[in-house]
Amino acid sequence: RGLGDVYKRQPQDYFYFSVAVKGLTGGHSGDDINKGRANANKLLVRFLTQLAAKYPMYLCEIDGGNLHNAIPREARALCAVPMKDKESVRVDLNIYTAEIENEFAVTEPNLKTELSSEAPCKEVIDMVTAGRLLKAVYAVHNGVYAMSQDIPGLVETSSNLASVKQADRK
C-alpha cells in the first residue's frame, strides 16, 4: 500500500520562485571528494531546510546533479512561500550566500545563487512530506568516511550525494 498522494493543488496568495546554486567546481566523486569542494545539492537543501523551518513553504520541484560519479556543480528547486514573506526570502538568500561564499572561499571562487520569480506550479508537495524529504537529504553524509591506511592521500571510502531528481507524476 502506498503512502497516499503527497501532492496538493497550488495554494493561492503565494510567491513562487526558483532558487539555484551554480558555478561550483564539481569533480569526480572518487578523485576530488577529499578536496573540500561544495556539493550543490547539499548547499541547496541546506538553504531550503532553513526556509522550511522559518516559513510555511511548499516544494514544487527539486533537481540537482547529472552524473552518479560527479560532485554536482548545480542544483535548483521551485518553491512557494506566502506572498508576505517574499522579500524576507530574498534577504535570507543574500545572508546565506554570504555565509557559503565565506565557507567555500578557497574551493568555490565562482559559487553563486539565484532567485527568480516563477509562474505558480499546478501542484505542490505537501509541507509535511517536503519537510521530511529535505531533512532526509540534509542528513545524508557527503564526503570522506575513511582514508587509506597504506597509501597516503588515497580516499578509501566516501559518499557523494551526486543527484537529486524528482520523477514525473504519471
Residue ranges and their predicted role:
Residues 70-75, 169:
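A short, glycine/Asx- and small/polar-enriched loop/turn
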Residues 27-30, 59, 63-72:
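A structural signal for small-residue-enriched, beta-sheet-centric alpha/beta enzyme cores
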Residues 17-19, 77, 113, 170:
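Hydrophobic residues positioned within well-ordered beta-strands of beta-sheet architectures
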Residues 2-7:
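Short, small-residue-biased leader/transition segments that mark boundaries at the very start
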Residues 154-170:
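Substrate-recognition/cap regions that form aromatic- and gly/pro-loop-enriched pockets
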Residues 21, 79-83:
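Short beta-strand-to-loop capping motifs
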Residues 11-32:
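Residues forming anionic-ligand binding surfaces in small-molecule and nucleic-acid pockets
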Residues 11-12, 33-63, 82-158:
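Acidic-enriched catalytic cores of C-N bond-cleaving enzymes acting on peptides and small amides
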